[in-house]
Structures are given as C-alpha cells and as structure tokens.
From Swiss-Prot:
In the absence of ligand, steroid hormone receptors are thought to be weakly associated with nuclear components; hormone binding greatly increases receptor affinity. The hormone-receptor complex appears to recognize discrete DNA sequences upstream of transcriptional start sites. A lipid is attached at C452 (S-palmitoyl cysteine). 17beta-estradiol binds at E358, R399, H529. Interacts with BCAS3. Binds DNA as a homodimer. Can form a heterodimer with ESR2. Interacts with coactivator NCOA5. Interacts with PELP1, the interaction is enhanced by 17-beta-estradiol; the interaction increases ESR1 transcriptional activity. Interacts with NCOA7; the interaction is ligand-inducible. Interacts with AKAP13, CUEDC2, HEXIM1, KDM5A, MAP1S, SMARD1, and UBE1C. Interacts with MUC1; the interaction is stimulated by 7 beta-estradiol (E2) and enhances ESR1-mediated transcription. Interacts with DNTTIP2, and UIMC1. Interacts with KMT2D/MLL2. Residues 267-600 are annotated as: Interaction with AKAP13. Residues 316-552 form the NR LBD domain. Residues 190-255 bind DNA. Residues 569-581 have a biased composition (Low complexity). Residues 35-179 are annotated as: Interaction with DDX5. This is Estrogen receptor. A zinc finger (NR C4-type) spans 190-210, 226-250.
Length: 600
C-alpha cells in the first residue's frame, strides 16, 4: 500500500532510519591502503557532508520499507526518476566544474569512492537489485577485493586508451580519406569529341577512338578533304562524318606526334631499369680499390666510339698533314686603291669587305678539314660561329711572318701600325697581331704546324661553352675530342720528324698551344671593336659578316661584348641557327669546282 507523504519531518526521520539500515553492512574498520601520493580531485573530502534535497511529491513504499527493515536487507525506497543530489552541494559543484559529464559524488563513507556509472538520477547507495556496490565485492571482513572484470572506461590503462583513441581516429580519418578520394575522382572528357577520355594520348586527354584516328593519320596518308566548308561539328555522334575536320580539331586542341607524358614509363622500361640498377649495384660491390683507381684514366680501347667508320680517325700523320695542306683556301685580293688616302670609314670598309669574302672560303676550308664533315650540321655551324675571327687572325699572322712590323691583309694590302691609327681602337689590336707574328717568326713556325694549329682552333672553339651562353652545346663532343687528339699526335710527329728530342717536342708543343690562348684574346678584342663600329654606323657590314657577328654574340657572355645583358628571344635563336646552316650550304663550293683534290 502506497501513501502520500504529508509532512517533511516524518519523511526525513524515516529516511534517516532507512539509510542507517543500508549502511550497517559497510560500518567496518576503514581500509588502510598504502598511498604513493596524495588523493587527487577524484576523491571527495569526507569532512564536508552533502546536502540531500527531499523530492516533492515522491512516493514512499511503507510496506516494502518495513519488510526490508525487519529482514535487515536493503531495498529501493524511491523511484529511479525522483531522487537527485541538490545542485547547491559542494559535491555537485565539484562534479560540474571538474569532471563535466561524470555523475556527482557524495561522501558518506570514509572509504574512497570510485567514479561509477549508475543509471540516470539514481543515488550511489540506492541501486536496483543485484547492482549494489558493483565494483567491490565483500570477500573478507577486513578487506575489499577488486572484481576481475571492471568497467572498461575506468580500468583501461592510459596507454590502452591512447592506442584505442588512435585506432578510432585512424579509422575515421581513413574513412574520410576514402570519401575525399572518391570525390576527387573526376571524369575526364575527350578534348576532340567530348566523349569519355580513356587516358592522356598525344599530349591531350582523348578517347580511344580519337587516339586511334590521330595515330592512323600521322602514320599513313592524311590527305583528307572536307565536303563542306572545313567547319564541321566534331562531337561524339558526328566525329566520323568528316575526317578532315576531325584531324584539324585534333591539331587545334594540341595533339602532336610524340606528345606523351614525361612521367610515364612502361612496364618493360621499368623492368629493364631495375635489371640495369641491380647489375650496376653488383658491379660496384665487386669492384676493388685498385680497379676504381685505374678507372680514373680510362684506356682508349674501352672508349665507346660513336663514329666508328670516320675516315679522319684512320688517317696516318702524313696523310693528315697532306689533307690539311690541300684544304688551304686561296689568297684573296682586296679592293684597295693606292690613290685614295685612308680614313676610318675607308679602312673599315676595306677590312670588312675582305673579311666577308674570306668567310666564304673559310666555310669551304672547314668542310675539307678531316673529321669536320663527319659532324652534324648543328655542330658544324656552332664551331664556325665560335672560331671564325680566330681563324682569320691566325691566317693574317701567318701571312705577316715575312714582313716584320707590318700586317699582310692581302697580297695588295700591307699595313703598318701608323696606318692603323686612323681607326679608333685599332692600334691596340694591331700591336697584339704584330706581337703574335713576331712570336711565330722567332719560333720558325712551319706551314705544316700552322695548318694543324688552325684546325685545332676550329675544333676546339666551341667545345667548352660559356655558362651564360643561350645556345645549346655540341652534340658530338667525343668525336671532336678524338679528332683533336689525332691532330695533336700529328704535331708531335712533325716535331719528331724534324729531329727534336722528346723534351724539345714537349716544350715546343706547349709553346704553340699557349699561343692559341693569345689568339683567342685578340679575337675577343676584335669582336668587341667590330661591334662598336657597327653600333656607330661607321661602316655597313655585309650579310655573312653581320650574321657571324650576331651569332658570336649569342655564344659569348653579353658582359664581354661591352653591352648590357640581353636575353635573345626564341625566334632570334631559331632564325640565327637556321640562317647559319643555310649559309654553310649556300657558300659551300665543292672542291672539284675550285680545283682542289678531295683527299678525305
């Protein structure tokens, strides 16, 4: 029978009696536990009792309470949804401020209280049947024993908690990553017909049909004719209606032969690369120290020859000398008029006209130098553009050996230092040329040695390009180096043939090669002077000479030419290279037309 409470006083007295019966089994001596440190905030000070708010309108089971008191057992006296701790108690304030969502604590017993998870709004000491004191079991009168299977949230160690949280975060992040990857996958469409693209083909995203069509077009005949106005619509449904417009659109969207992705590699290429890397790794592991030291000086027998059938490499020293002597250009006469006095314009006009005509014969001479004709057209143009003024100057110095203090520009044009004063800045160049001619005369340079030195200048001029050069370097450097070695051997053969000792041969070879650096310095000075004359419009330059001057400025650093650095455009580079190549073919005179025997 349930009765409604009419007064708080009677209810409170009965409540204290019930609580005393419930706490009677727990009134044992306090558990003395060794404590490594002071109690933390999870334990409540027992000196501060909690305030219990009596619920209004709560129902009390008198019969059940009396029966429970007589039997000495505990029983629930209030419903689970009616008893709560007062919000004004210190225990409630502690739980709200420090532990957030954890249940509030009471400090009735002197024993430490664990953080429990009771059902909602239930007192820790008023539980349903079978759930009273869930985490402590009474085994002995003087001690408590911890249950083996405690609540996971409380009895899991910190490391386990961290691992579990890490696994949860990992799984959630992987799920998010998968969702992001799925959303990142976008559908590609063909740039030609707007169909679904199957991949990146010939430089654009395209479908299999357009890829195959473009492949057939570039490999076979593509002389398609449009039956209309060359403006047909190319889409998924009408791409086969007009082959001409389809091919036109392929080119418009950027399809090109060889337009593949640079980062793409086939399985066969990767397999070969792995095999090659494994083989190189085994070779490196098995190589000893003395073999590594021997590799610093590779034997000529193990050098890979790219020009195995080059006739220049099979020539003997005498044959090389004979070929170089036969390739020498003829002497050219100038347009000098002795009746007219020299002026700056007239002298520069004579010299530039003479140099322009000599350039034509220089191209034909270079074609007949052993080994030069085996190079590709790019390397031939590159070497001539770098060495043309050095070759003209060493020829001038060689002709002037028999005329001390004078320079023989042509058989009918012999100038001394005083005559060079009429041109601004010419005296310095004249002095350097006269000093080199005097050095040749002192060394008694022979004609065979001269032709070898001139060939070395041609082949060695563009081998070591400047870092600031805008043009690409030589493509067949190995072949050029082998031809240079052949010419050096020819020089040594000539010295040995003249009866010089080994020490004298080495000394003379070093002296001759040192003169080449002086000629390079004179060439740079002459190029700078010629460019300044061009900028001042002192004399108009001829086509081939002007082209060679501009090409030389592209090879050399701009700061050396005395002008601020200027980055040439791609069109200028292409025009210069193509024009120079055209000049090699235009000004090339076959040896048979000049009456020179072709010995190569």
């Amino acid at each position: 029978m349930t009765m409604t409470l009419h007064t708080k006083a009677s209810g409170m007295a009965l409540l204290h009696q019930i609580q005393g019966n419930e706490l009677e089994p727990l009134n044992r001596p306090q558990l003395k536990m060794p404590m490594e440190r002071a109690l933390g905030e999870v334990y409540v000070d027992n000196s501060k009792p909690a305030v219990f708010n009596y619920p209004e309108g709560a129902a009390y089971e008198f019969n059940a309470a009396a029966a429970a008191a007589a039997a000495g057992a505990s029983a629930p006296v209030y419903g689970q949804s009616s008893i709560t701790y007062g919000p004004g108690s210190e225990a409630a304030a502690f739980g709200a401020n420090s532990l957030g969502a954890f249940p509030q604590l009471n400090s009735v017993s002197p024993s430490p209280l664990m953080l429990l998870h009771p059902p909602p709004h239930v007192s820790p000491f008023l539980h349903p049947h079978g759930h009273q004191v869930p985490y402590y079991l009474e085994n002995e009168p003087s001690a408590y024993a911890v249950r083996d299977t405690g609540p996971p949230a409380f009895y899991r160690s910190n490391s386990d908690n961290r691992r579990q949280n890490g696994r949860e975060r990992l799984s959630s992040s992987s799920e998010k990553g998968n969702m992001i990857m799925e959303s990142a996958k976008e559908t590609r469409y063909c740039a030609v017909c707007n169909d679904y693209a199957s991949g990146y083909h010939y430089g654009v995203w395209s479908c299999e049909g357009c890829k195959a069509f473009f492949k057939r077009s570039i490999q076979g005949h593509n002389d398609y004719m449009c039956p209309a106005t060359n403006q047909c619509t190319i889409d998924k449904n009408r791409r086969k209606s007009c082959q001409a417009c389809r091919l036109r659109k392929c080119y418009e969207v950027g399809m090109m032969k060889g337009g593949i992705r640079k980062d793409r590699r086939g399985g066969r290429m990767l397999k070969h690369k792995r095999q090659r890397d494994d083989l190189e790794g085994r070779n490196e592991m098995g190589t000893s120290g003395d073999m590594r030291a021997a590799n610093l000086w590779p034997s000529p027998l193990v050098i890979k020859h790219t020009k195995k059938n080059s006739p220049a490499l099979s020539l003997t020293a005498d044959q090389m000398v004979s070929a170089l002597l036969d390739a020498e250009p003829p002497l050219i006469y100038s347009e000098y008029d002795p009746s007219r006095p020299f002026s700056e314009a007239s002298m520069m006009g004579l010299l530039t006209n003479l140099a322009d005509r000599e350039l034509v014969h220089m191209i034909n001479w270079a074609k007949r130098v052993p080994g030069f004709g085996d190079l590709n057209l790019h390397d031939q143009v590159h070497l001539l553009e770098c060495a043309w003024l050095e070759i003209l100057m060493i020829g001038l110095v060689w002709r002037s050996m028999e005329h001390p203090g004078k320079l023989l520009f042509a058989p009918n044009l012999l100038l001394d230092r005083n005559q060079g004063k009429c041109v601004e800045g010419m005296v310095e160049i004249f002095d350097m040329l006269l000093a080199t001619s005097s050095r040749f005369r002192m060394m008694n340079l022979q004609g065979e040695e001269f032709v070898c030195l001139k060939s070395i200048i041609l082949l060695n001029s563009g081998v070591y390009t400047f870092l600031s050069s805008t043009l690409k370097s030589l493509e067949e450097k190995d072949h050029i180096h082998r031809v240079l070695d052949k010419i050096n051997d020819t020089l040594i053969h000539l010295m040995a043939k003249a009866g010089l000792t080994l020490q004298q041969q080495h000394r003379r070879l070093a002296q001759l090669l040192l003169i080449l650096s002086h000629i390079r310095h004179m060439s740079n000075k002459g190029m700078e002077h010629l460019y300044n004359m061009k900028c001042k419009n002192v004399v108009p330059l001829y086509d081939l000479l002007l082209e060679m001057l501009d090409a030389h400025r592209l090879h050399a650093p701009a700061s050396r030419m005395g002008v601020p650095p200027e980055e040439p455009s791609q069109s200028q580079l292409t025009t210069t290279s193509s024009t120079s190549a055209h000049s090699l073919q235009t000004y090339y005179i076959p040896p048979e037309a000049e009456g020179f025997p072709n010995t190569i």
